């Protein structure tokens, strides 16, 4: 970050837990990031869409909770992703008043509001999030199955997902991400995401969702 910093740098965008790798940033790393942001007077937009789906007792730390960060952090949370209400298209942000004033003065007129039914569904989910316990049990079991399956295939490997209902699969020994993706669609009629849209390091990887609730999924 120090090497990338310029006089024009105003903001850092962070995804934690990460999409697509599922990595959860540890407290020590977040503390260093917070110190960097404070030192250089930067705003941090922190996407925490999957904050409620973290496995194996890994500690999830909200960046805004660290010293000096509340007044410079925009926390983005997603009902659609975090609570498995994908079709609702509902998210919200949490930030200090001075940031919210700027937001309401610009973004609201562009983004608009979601429909009433989605808002009511989101409110119900936030008031009683007890279903997340079962939701995470299901996905915890599935991620272990997915991990075993992909690591048993010659030329394919993946790390155990730390969060979310995603897995980041390394297929670089089989071909490019686009080639493997096209093969899977043709041979199995299954859609996955090639890793290339996620940047140069996404080449040779596939982003796969194991989030369907059907038992035969």
Segments the model singles out, each with a brief description of its role:
Residues 1-57:
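Active-site phosphate-binding strand-loop segment of PLP-dependent enzymes
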Residues 28-35, 39, 141, 145-148, ...:
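Alpha-helical scaffolding segments of alpha/beta enzyme cores, especially the outer helices
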Residues 66, 71-140, 147-149:
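Conserved core segment of the aminotransferase class I/II
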Residues 97, 173-174, 212-215:
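Helix N-cap motif at beta-to-alpha junctions
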Residues 2-3, 152, 179, 183-192, ...:
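PLP-dependent enzyme catalytic core of the Aspartate aminotransferase-like
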